[in-house]
């Protein structure tokens, strides 16, 4: 399937005409990553069709194995049609502080500023000061956080693969988007998630929660340390053994 051809066809066939396209790379929940040439093509298509573009880039710093997440604003001409949302939640370990910023096309930025003036009174000043300090200070913390996620990713993915549950290591984000093993796929993601919770004591997000096309996946969050992650893998291993229909093919749990 030619993604860009399908996108252009969807734009052409839609009525009313789309006004805005939202991109999310690295993606949540799929962890999908793209290179700059993909972004360039998206800007070309959207410019030709006079569509605004919003890029939700929450995980640019949580990238592994040499991958670098491209900003949409690196593309020449993108400023004419695009804006980007950046969050400090993952890069600076500030989830719940609800702090980030928008940059890009001045009309889009002004529209958001006007809308927010109707909805709230601005962010608590100490949070703004903390965000400025994080952005302007030493960035060692960002590298440390990314290394923590990378280590957790490796333990989880290596452990699942050692059980015969084939998953790919994501190149970015703090998630693993895991296809449900074939022998359990008939359950769907919600029932399989319930089974993991009750029998393996492992909590995951059912893919159906992200849309119907996610129903053959579950999402793991890299939010527990390596020791707890190994405990989770042992719980999954025991569930597989008890079911006697999914056989471990690997060595041990790393």
Where are these regions (language model features)?
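PLP-dependent class I/II
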Residues: 1-254
